[in-house]
Structure formats: structure tokens, C-alpha cells
Amino acid sequence: MTYSICYIVPPHILREIAKKGNNSQRAWALQTLTISEQFRGRREVVSLMPTVFAVAGEKRRTVYDAKSGYVLPGTLVRGEGDPSTGDVAVDEAYDGLGATYDLYKSVFDRNSIDDRGMRLDSTVHYGANYDNAFWNGSQMVFGDGDGEIFQRFTKSIDVI
């Protein structure tokens, strides 16, 4: 099975920001592009990783915190049934993963996104001012944005 790395903000948009943004915007856009290129090279490795499945019909969400670093998945900060953490990005990711599971269950009668009970994992606070979010074949990863052009990527259910 081959997995693709799917980004929310496409590379051509980041290249335009790198060309036309102010100094800090250009720096963050170039940093995001560089990290994105590194992940494209890891695509094959991710596809070889085992997928963890939940018991049929059970919602199972896990949210990790990269703490502005680049190591995935990061530190586990919230699992299925755990109370709200008070970290807005963590709680938005958790709630968004739940809405995603519920959508697939109620509209498509699927057991998670793959119909085989796939655990829904995500990592928040990825990178320093990382201007993107992506699916790496096994989890969603959310940057917090630079605060000028992009805000945290957990704010929009369309991203999650």
C-alpha cells in the first residue's frame, strides 16, 4: 500500500509567500517548504509502518503534542475519553477527530475513515510557526501558523 503526504496549503502558495512576503513571512514559508520536502522523502517509510486498528465500531482518538519540534508523534496529551486539557489546539484536534469519525459513521456507515476501525491520531504544535497541516499516511499533523498569514490549523473543521 502506498500513502501520500497531503498538505492543506499547497507548495505553490508557500512559494509565492516566500517571494512576496515580508522578511518574517518569507522565512516561515521557506522553513515550511523545507520541512515539506523532507516529508516527501519519508513517504515510503511511513507506508511500511503497521497500522493500529481499534475494536470494530469504537471511536478511538489520540492527540500528541510536538511541543514546537519536528519529532512525530510527540508526547501523548489526550486519549479517547480523557477530559479537556485546556490547550485549545489539543481540544480542537480531539473534537475535530470525533466529528470526522461521526461523519464517516453516520453518512457513510463506515467504521472510521478506512472502514476497518483505524485509530484517529493527530499531532498539534508541530514545528515553530509551521504554516501547514498534513496527513502523513497514518495521522494528521497541525502547525500553529505564523500568526500573520496563517493561524493554528486546528481552528477549522475543514482542515481536520
PLM feature segments, named:
Residues 1-159:
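Zymogen propeptides/activation segments of proteases
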